[in-house]
Amino acid sequence: MTLTERLREKISRAFYNHGLLCASYPIPIILFTGFCILACCYPLLKLPLPGTGPVEFTTPVKDYSPPPVDSDRKQGEPTEQPEWYVGAPVAYVQQIFVKSSVFPWHKNLLAVDVFRSPLSRAFQLVEEIRNHVLRDSSGIRSLEELCLQVTDLLPGLRKLRNLLPEHGCLLLSPGNFWQNDWERFHADPDIIGTIHQHEPKTLQTSATLKDLLFGVPGKYSGVSLYTRKRMVSYTITLVFQHYHAKFLGSLRARLMLLHPSPNCSLRAESLVHVHFKEEIGVAELIPLVTTYIILFAYIYFSTRKIDMVKSKWGLALAAVVTVLSSLLMSVGLCTLFGLTPTLNGGEIFPYLVVVIGLENVLVLTKSVVSTPVDLEVKLRIAQGLSSESWSIMKNMATELGIILIGYFTLVPAIQEFCLFAVVGLVSDFFLQMLFFTTVLSIDIRRMELADLNKRLPPEACLPSAKPVGQPTRYERQLAVRPSTPHTITLQPSSFRNLRLPKRLRVVYFLARTRLAQRLIMAGTVVWIGILVYTDPAGLRNYLAAQVTEQSPLGEGALAPMPVPSGMLPPSHPDPAFSIFPPDAPKLPENQTSPGESPERGGPAEVVHDSPVPEVTWGPEDEELWRKLSFRHWPTLFSYYNITLAKRYISLLPVIPVTLRLNPREALEGRHPQDGRSAWPPPGPIPAGHWEAGPKGPGGVQAHGDVTLYKVAALGLATGIVLVLLLLCLYRVLCPRNYGQLGGGPGRRRRGELPCDDYGYAPPETEIVPLVLRGHLMDIECLASDGMLLVSCCLAGHVCVWDAQTGDCLTRIPRPGRQRRDSGVGSGLEAQESWERLSDGGKAGPEEPGDSPPLRHRPRGPPPPSLFGDQPDLTCLIDTNFSAQPRSSQPTQPEPRHRAVCGRSRDSPGYDFSCLVQRVYQEEGLAAVCTPALRPPSPGPVLSQAPEDEGGSPEKGSPSLAWAPSAEGSIWSLELQGNLIVVGRSSGRLEVWDAIEGVLCCSSEEVSSGITALVFLDKRIVAARLNGSLDFFSLETHTALSPLQFRGTPGRGSSPASPVYSSSDTVACHLTHTVPCAHQKPITALKAAAGRLVTGSQDHTLRVFRLEDSCCLFTLQGHSGAITTVYIDQTMVLASGGQDGAICLWDVLTGSRVSHVFAHRGDVTSLTCTTSCVISSGLDDLISIWDRSTGIKFYSIQQDLGCGASLGVISDNLLVTGGQGCVSFWDLNYGDLLQTVYLGKNSEAQPARQILVLDNAAIVCNFGSELSLVYVPSVLEKLD
């Protein structure tokens, strides 16, 4: 067993156990699922409804002026402006985006030095902004005149009064954590603790205080002990009430002059106006609500045709609740983990959840309702889940793999979508497996058995299984039987579609192909590929940056050079000119500060292998505010009792500020406690030591950002705990043998159900067939005309059976023996003797009363009454070897083989005539010597049997029914009417009367045996081992119309076979002979529509005209010997060979229509219907092909040794054999309709051959026995 098979088996078993759990305890599981849904949806209480997110409108900065109010707008004037863009905004928001880093980085710097010095410069920037004034011709403009003046905070925000501004300008910066006091900041030993002390203990869904003051999301701030970029980002937010272009321009120019950003390419060209809608937007919900209504209606009208569902409304409602809960759980979990579900630009997410959820609902419903109706509900649920387990997990793994690949592209848009998608998939899988499966089990449980019997659906319109409480079924279940009698492999994948309505066909098509999920996966891959290449943070820009860095002219190849003071202009971005505070002490040349060692800052101490914090500006920095929560601005203004509902604010272009600090400033800003044992020591330490995660100070908890990686780890841990909890619940609640055989006598193991690949287990029944016993060896030849059945075993015995009653009508013994009676009574008597023989009877031999008292064998079976005309010779067998006289010259007795009567007698042997002669004289019979061969007839007419040599069976003297001769073994057999045509290995052709058991005529012997026969109307064709063909014509010599018909037409279209009277004289004339039809032995022979087709080991087929033996075509197309041939009245010819190929030919033109390789090995049998070709091979595989195109529909894997056991009952009904059973298949769709077991006696025997009769009966060859099975009536109605 391969790894994939073991994994598939384990997944199937896990889903099977889960199905048992859900169906056994539905109420607790539904309550548990409901609690999980409510818990996951709790964060949604703080979110607006979908569609109420902010709306944007962009205008250019140049010549901007506030729009007029609504009354000033001209009526009917066409405009592209939205309706809400009227009047002045609530406020103008100006963000000053600061990026700061310490460069160059020394290895003796601490982790806290990354953000302490950059944050300290925020106080200086705030002072510069507050002190900025504009002097022009109109007067002096200051910040206090233009900013938004705020008053007190709301009464419930007392904790924030020292952190947010009151009674002044609304100006926010990280310095607000320390009341904009630099001394407080410098004296704070735990900066991170101060920043996070006002954070809620649980994950917050709306804007937090840190986001408000920093102005950027927490993960972009860089204020963390574990950051590796060594860059700090924050904003200083100014809120203006009036727009003054000159003041804003002068502020921008001053800040960019003081803190230039040489590589900044941000464009200050547009204003973004953001309008906030009402909290309740019902109009925006109409498309989504309509979608769910359509979903409900579609599932309801689809399940109306599934009669195995009790409540269609309930099932549809459960499906809608499942999909809606999946969406709400996804959004709630995303919100809980800090992912803001704005759905801006991605509002397709709810509809993707609908599509995926609908498809999974259809898959589960289809799988469960296709299970056998006679099983318990929990077993049906378990089996339905198990059958779809592999496809569900395979699709789940594929989707998660695509999401994982997309996440590691590091493109923000793709990462956000992937995080939403993974949460949605996990939520949907959780609800499908727990909620919908449990609801489905409750609904099916309500379907009572009486209602099922009244309204059986197309999937279960077959008779139910035998009552499970009967001991016979229990014994049969314990018997050894293969786990899967049949495995149907569909090419391409198909599903159960037996007489289904069109709406159910659509449903099952979606469930089978997973079309929606595959299209979504393909679209996701294409979308990810496009974004990876086109996104600003994607592959194209990354490659361009790499090429630039590796270029000899790139900035990375030029080392920084020390420049003496005073050589650069004031606008140069050197940190010494832009960062030093104006009151910083000027040190003389070659001197250092008091606390700094002379070696510190030297070139040897710089960590060159660490990532250089290059301050870069990209297009994503222009609108970093978009990454904030959509509740960021409404939350800020709501603190001052200002609402933004139905109003808008204007966001001004960002002002970039770059700060580069040298290591000396980082050391000067360090707190005294930073150098203690709490942080890495300031002495020389290995490079990157603090990056491995320094410990926080004792007793002080180091607050870290709740990053996505932490959330992922938390989610993984939660999932593991949940799985372990469910496993423990299963172990506690379910016993080890739950749902298996030990639970009851009629409960069946799932592996014993003949399920196909899609989990459908059709009803199985058990009947007692008519067993035809009469052969001691395996049956080799079998023929029937619909009413009579002829069988021949390897011993040479021929039995004629009545196909209606199963009675043995005639028994023809081996050659070389005489027959005294051939009536029906003797046949029944012989049948009884053979049954006693096969049953191992211990009765003693019956001796003739007038025989002398001779020594008897101590035990042994009685001689069969079949040879009653012979004296009993068993008394002559002497087993007392010790009392026998020793012969001086030992003789070798001749072997007692009767099959070869014409062997040479030249070698001396022991003569038994002295013993046998006395017994024959006492019986009154003449001594019988070995008869010689009858001389061949001089002409081509077959010699007639000497019927006048013996009287009727009623006469006293025994008659010779036929002259014994060395005919050889029987190689071929055909039956028509009451005539049996036998072809023997000696080349002799014989015609027998099937009713009387007499030989009508025979041909002369030739050196080549007869390998195949065709008996059609009055023509007989014999194919011989040497490749020749003999054409015979059958004639009678009584009246002009000697034929009478027996019975009525059967299931076939042809009338019943003619019956020849026993008083008729039957003769056969050899009309034509084709001496060299093939170069090698003929192995296949068929005739229809006046054409005869032969197949040989010379790899060719030949088509002859039946009336004059004229060869019409020689067909070449196989690379191996021909093994089977089929031809019908429509002149369609099919052939199979040892090369495993099947060829379709046109008999009218001799052209090959199609050629396919069907099997791995010989093609053993071949038959056709009006629409398909059915083949079987030595690989025990039955394949069904399209007759017109040669396309393979599907294949059925048979049991070992049962590959050739198949028969076609009608154009859409196929019967196949298995280990002690026969199965019925629908040819149109490949569905297993029913499996019928033939009792305990046949369980261990494979069905080697199946022959379909015209009276709705099937004959199965189980070695030395035949089983006569009548087709179930429901299949006849289906036909």
Swiss-Prot record:
Matching SUPFAM superfamilies: Multidrug efflux transporter AcrB transmembrane domain, WD40 repeat-like
WD repeats: 771-811, 952-1002, 1005-1042, 1077-1114, 1117-1155, 1158-1195, 1197-1235
Record-level GO BP terms: cholesterol metabolic process; COPII-coated vesicle cargo loading; immune response; negative regulation of cholesterol biosynthetic process; positive regulation of cholesterol biosynthetic process; regulation of cholesterol biosynthetic process; regulation of fatty acid biosynthetic process; response to hypoxia
Protein's membrane topology: Multi-pass membrane protein
Taxonomy, superkingdom: Eukaryota
Sequence ranges on the Lumenal membrane side: 40-279, 334-344, 423, 540-709
UniProt name for this protein: Sterol regulatory element-binding protein cleavage-activating protein
Gene: SCAP
